[in-house]
Amino acid sequence: DETPIQVLKEEGRRPQSKSYVWLVRTGDNGGIPIILYNYTPTRAGSHAAAFLAGADPGYYLMVDGYKGYNKVPEAQRCCCWAHIRRYWLRAIPKGHEKDYTHPAVQGFLYCNKLFEYERSYREKGLSLKQIYHRRLKDQKPVIEAFLSWLDQLHPESGDRLIKAINYSNGCRPFMMNYLKDGACSLSNNLSENSIRPLVVGRKNWLFCDTPAGADASMKIYSMIETAKANELDPLKYLSFLLEHRPGAEMSDEELEQFAPWSKLAQ
């Protein structure tokens, strides 16, 4: 996910220029929670590609409909069904929430059915392998029906309805990628929740003075939010780091001892 920030002293840019923070985090599949923030001066998709450089080829990338993510190579892009559902929800006219003949309501219900299945899997405590097989049985037919239904829509009016159709069509190439692995999420909600502390903080600190300050701030955010995600007290974790002072001269194995999920940090 990405969100704008203001950095006052960027070379060759006005103080009012819009800069960006990118967030990348691990999914909710039971692995180690890692949350990383990265400052860049623009929203160009090449920044996302650089941020993710070095990841194993073929990894799954859960994002919204921003086309800049198409520049990320070697990733299997997955679309966020929460974003798609939100477009259909916004397209429902006031007072028509129960009008099941209205296309916006129908589109919303198609999307919502996927989330109902996901909720049932969690309630039943299914394994990732079981989720993979159940998704193919339950959810793939829903998506296929949704796409066939979408092909039949040709509205002549209704800006929000047209936006919902266009947004959904833009996500077509990625709609079923999450079905390939039970560890994939259905939505990008986890990233949106993780970027919220930065958004709330931005309302208080307003801007960063320099690019170096913005970069340092995002490193601090990364440490604090990853510590919180690993159920650590962030103040105690930062004190732990300052006491031990891990440095660049250490090997990767030595540095990992100071990660929030390490036994030493826990």
Predicted features along the sequence, with ranges:
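Catalytic center-proximal scaffold of phosphoryl-transfer enzymes
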Residues: E2-Q266
